[in-house]
Amino acid sequence: MSEGQEGGVEKDYNNRNLQENMKIIWIDGTFGIGKSAVAAAIVKKIPQAHLLEFDALQEKYKPTSDSDRFGRRYPEAKKYLVDALVDEITEIIQEGGCNCLVIPVALINDYCNQKLIDGFANIESHHFILTAKTEILHQRINNQENRDIDLAVTYMPEATQYLSNHYYDASIIDTSNMSIDSVAKEIIESITR
């Protein structure tokens, strides 16, 4: 079992020698809102930005416990994936190959909040929560390829409630009537002011 995982040695990410000019842009929101598309658009427009796709970690990392294997279905509820994301972020920062890390992820539980938002509090972070009217969100979910529609719809109320009750310092962007590029532009303008 590697460090930082359940039963292993807990890492202290705040005391690492982390790059001072690094920024993290958290693209947050419920499932199907367009986090990945917006994050990809941002990375195309910011030199030396790096996209770290949380969803891609499911291909790379496998469950380490029965609760991860058989527990809640959404990836952010699986501690081993959140721990893997922490490790990936730390590695990218320490390598120093980029100065802006863009991470689309639904930060919809206390473990994500603690490990990711609080865990990297010593790095300049910009947290954006994307929202949309419910009917528009349902349309987006139904029109996406490679989307687990049942998962997205099932956990939407829980995700929406968590995001509404946490992260009061995050910037909320209603994407209902916005294109992907216009959302990306608004985020970039916000962090460069």
Predicted regions located by residue number:
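Hydrophobic anchor at the beta1->P-loop junction of P-loop NTPases
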Residues: I27
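P-loop (Walker A) phosphate-binding loop of NTP-binding proteins
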Residues: T30
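ATP-binding Walker
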Residues: I33
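Walker A/P-loop
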Residues: S36
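Conserved substrate/cofactor phosphate-moiety recognition/catalytic segment
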Residues: A40-D83
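Glycine-rich phosphate-binding loop used to anchor ATP phosphates in small-molecule kinases
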Residues: Y80-A121
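Conserved phosphate-donor/acceptor-positioning beta-strand/loop module used by diverse small-molecule
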Residues: N122-R140
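Small-molecule kinase domains that catalyze NTP-dependent phosphoryl transfer to phosphate-bearing small molecules
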Residues: N143-E186
